[in-house]
């Protein structure tokens, strides 16, 4: 699949900075964003999490930022107003068949973007470049911990 997957939803773009995200959320009537009280900082991981409720079609929205830039956005949709089949059909019409499909989720993926439709009804956009960096960093830390543990055990 070519890199044709969207990296934005209603003016919210993967890669945008926190202040831009807050401005867009404040101006969009689909979200009930309350400003800084909807923002949590995770200093140990240089990450921020913005969680807000939505109005009408969106029940909840989550935005995860790393080093100040948005890399995951997830929208839990209101199943009273929209259904899984309608969203799935719309995504297939726009982006073709998913790269992977199972009872829990449908995933469209390119080198830079993952778009996932999860059950019961959540749509996620993920910046794969940042996501893969996090996975690589975690593997490096785990490898160092394993080595350290082995060195400790070898001391006996």
Segments (PLM) and residue ranges:
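Non-cytosolic coordination micro-motifs
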Residues: 1-38, 42, 74-156
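Mid-chain, structured segments of secreted extracytoplasmic proteins
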Residues: 44-82
């Amino acid at each position: 699949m070519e890199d044709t997957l969207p990296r934005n939803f209603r003016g919210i773009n993967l890669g945008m900075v926190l202040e831009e995200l807050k401005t867009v959320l404040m101006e969009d009537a689909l979200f009930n964003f309350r400003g800084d009280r909807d923002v949590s900082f995770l200093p140990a991981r240089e990450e921020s999490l913005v969680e807000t409720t939505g109005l009408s079609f969106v029940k909840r929205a989550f935005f995860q930022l790393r080093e100040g830039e948005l890399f995951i956005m997830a929208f839990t949709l209101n199943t009273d107003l929209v259904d899984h089949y309608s969203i799935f059909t719309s995504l297939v019409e726009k982006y073709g068949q998913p790269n992977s499909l199972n009872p829990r989720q449908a995933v469209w993926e390119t080198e830079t973007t993952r778009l996932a439709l999860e059950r019961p009804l959540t749509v996620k956009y993920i910046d794969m470049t940042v996501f893969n960096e996090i996975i690589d960093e975690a593997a490096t830390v785990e490898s160092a911990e394993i080595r350290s543990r082995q060195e400790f055990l070898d001391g006996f």
